């Protein structure tokens, strides 16, 4: 697990764009990365950012296809990507069995909105269908598992955020993996590596709605509800110190750091949900 102290220099994500202007994460770039990864040419994260690794992979693809090596994704380069270059997002309804650029773009947009569907692979299978249904329910759309015009329009809106501030769940937090792209999938929370037995504190007052073992890799988990569908989640604990149904205040100890569930080492996995959508906790935590 990558770790970085929050008292160190500010975290900066820098990338060299393929165009003269720096760009934020883009679902189309993520789809390109998925296609390059499928061809064995791109080993970086599927992060939707045009950086040096993406540019290098494009040139490798062009050289392999014996077309002009200019780093520009034009029609010939798209054809060289094969099935993963077909179908722009919005050109057709997406459902189980579909494959292509648009499916990979859809996966990335779903993840950005808090509904990841496993590895980014551009193949519409059961996990993408389930994520589409969860998003449709969240967005008050018809729940049919098909990503048509209304679903894509809703995904074009900004991702949700938590509407109130949070406190740090550890007294001396060190940042590990952040919310967002990690390798070929999406990390839905923030990891805080810490020694086993380190106290974990409620980031906001609320009612405990889960306190126990949870399958799916969570291990010992505490979930606290905060009102209108907002929840904070504290996973991989070694001990739980609260009970379901109890109202707790901000700063109350909920348990101890551990490595229960699917964890490579002792750390707190801290997750925030808004009506089921995973949102970036760092946007609500205090600046250091």
Question: What is each of the regions a protein language model found here?
Answer:
Residues 58-61, 132, 251-254:
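Conserved hydrophobic/aromatic packing and binding residues within compact polymer-binding modules
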Residues 123, 129-130, 134-138, 142, ...:
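Polar/charged, compositionally biased leader and regulatory segments
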């Amino acid at each position: 697990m990558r770790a970085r102290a929050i008292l160190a220099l500010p975290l900066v994500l820098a990338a060299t764009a393929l165009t003269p202007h720096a760009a934020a994460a883009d679902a189309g770039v993520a789809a390109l990365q998925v296609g390059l990864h499928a061809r064995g040419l791109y080993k970086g994260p599927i992060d939707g950012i045009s950086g040096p690794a993406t540019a290098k992979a494009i040139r490798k693809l062009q050289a392999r296809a014996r077309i002009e090596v200019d780093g520009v994704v034009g029609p010939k380069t798209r054809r060289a990507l094969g099935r993963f270059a077909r179908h722009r997002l919005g050109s057709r309804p997406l459902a189980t069995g579909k494959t292509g650029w648009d499916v990979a773009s859809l996966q990335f947009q779903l993840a950005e909105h808090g509904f990841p569907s496993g590895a980014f692979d551009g193949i519409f299978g059961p996990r993408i269908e389930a994520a589409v249904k969860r998003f449709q329910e969240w967005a008050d759309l018809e729940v049919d598992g098909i990503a048509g015009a209304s679903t894509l329009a809703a995904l074009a809106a900004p991702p949700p955020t938590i509407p109130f501030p949070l406190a740090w769940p550890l007294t001396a937090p060190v940042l590990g993996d952040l919310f967002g792209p990690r390798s070929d999938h999406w990390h839905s929370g923030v990891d805080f590596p810490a020694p086993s037995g380190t106290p974990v504190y409620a980031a906001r007052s609320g009612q405990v709605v889960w306190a126990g073992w949870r399958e799916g890799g969570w291990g010992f988990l505490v979930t606290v509800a905060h009102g209108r569908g907002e929840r904070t989640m504290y996973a991989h604990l070694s001990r739980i110190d609260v009970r379901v149904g109890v109202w707790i205040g901000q700063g109350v100890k909920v348990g101890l750091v551990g490595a229960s569930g699917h964890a490579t080492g002792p750390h707190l996995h801290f997750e925030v949900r808004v009506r089921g959508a995973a949102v970036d906790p760092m946007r609500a935590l205090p600046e250091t």
